[in-house]
Amino acid sequence: MSRFLICSFALVLLYPAGIDMYLVGLPRIAADLNASEAQLHIAFSVYLAGMAAAMLFAGKVADRSGRKPVAIPGAALFIIASVFCSLAETSTLFLAGRFLQGLGAGCCYVVAFAILRDTLDDRRRAKVLSLLNGITCIIPVLAPVLGHLIMLKFPWQSLFWTMATMGIAILMLSLFILKETRPAAPAASDKPRENSESLLNRFFLSRVVITTLSVSVILTFVNTSPVLLMEIMGFERGEYATIIALTAGVSMTVSFSTPFALGIFKPRTLMITSQVLFLAAGITLAVSPSHAVSLFGITLICAGFSVGFGVAMSQALGPFSLRAGVASSTLGIAQVCGSSLWIWLAAVVGIGAWNMLIGILIACSIVSLLLIMFIAPGRPVAAHEEIHHHA
């Protein structure tokens, strides 16, 4: 079992590492490529576009051909794209490399969640996804620090060679450690069950909405945090970094505590708690009389996301024993596109950073609470259908 957990965690980590590690080198990259930092900031969106494009096909291929045939090319593409970025001499080539990086990371991301669905029952999967959420919270803090240390002695290209090295490690895991977890092709008697695993299932769609809104909350916070903390609240750059590190610490602490909470409380209780924390954060930020109260509201955001997201993802994947790859892809596409669409629309309409965050917090909590209360899980999948054993 440990091999599946290690491989899944490694496959997921390519996604945040690809986002956060290169940011510290952005000024030097812009200077070397004769581009402005503003022009290269689109590299974030290009990377996410690559991930979304990968998810359009990766899930279906993983369900038909297996998890390894998607993970291995995905890791290989991430390696090649990282080297391509390091060799880029124009901003256009650099952005093309970032898109290819996103394609590779997207393939690995989809496979990671499909593997967890294949190998864990509902309760254990919720615990593991909460732990995974805690680990991914470390990356936005550690990756820029690692990038800074690398750039003290080496040029910016070394950041992408480091990513390529990570990709090589994950490729080796996928080749030699990971075993195939895709369920055997269904017998004729199982065809009705395969056909019943519809993506239009009300329960699945409700969890897609909940997780997409939750990701929109956390990405809105990440995108608006420099404006909120430095421009509006007046913190210096060093103080901003400290606050972000502390919020990541809150996220990690809550994420690592959630598996223990699942041993005491029902998953539904934790999901309701998550949305109540979002609502409390929105109200706190809306009426905050001081910076200290606002910072408390920000910690509620991190706690709310960490306590509920892993549980909601586990519930979303629960109905899909034979189509876990497609379900994982659908979740990923909805989360990436939905959150990006909200942030873009809010910017186009001219909603300020503060109101943008408050608005998504309150909308997410109200919509999600209604869905949690009125759309309950269907019939649990039987134990022999839930966990697939492999040699």
From Swiss-Prot:
GO biological process, alphabetically ordered: response to antibiotic
Family annotation (Pfam families): MFS_1 (PF07690)
Gene Ontology molecular function, alphabetical: transmembrane transporter activity
Naturally occurring in which organism (per UniProt): Escherichia coli O7:K1 (strain IAI39 / ExPEC)
This protein's UniProt keywords: Antibiotic resistance, Cell inner membrane, Cell membrane, Membrane, Transmembrane, Transmembrane helix, Transport
Subcellular location: Cell inner membrane
Family affiliation: Belongs to the major facilitator superfamily. DHA1 family. MdtL (TC 2.A.1.2.22) subfamily.
GO cellular component labels: plasma membrane
TM segment ranges: 4-24, 42-62, 69-89, 93-113, 131-151, 158-178, 203-222, 243-263, 269-289, 293-313, 331-351, 356-376
Domain of life: Bacteria
Bilayer topology term: Multi-pass membrane protein
Protein name as annotated: Multidrug resistance protein MdtL
Main location group: membrane
Functional summary from the UniProt entry: Confers resistance to chloramphenicol.
Stretches of the chain forming a coiled coil according to its record: none
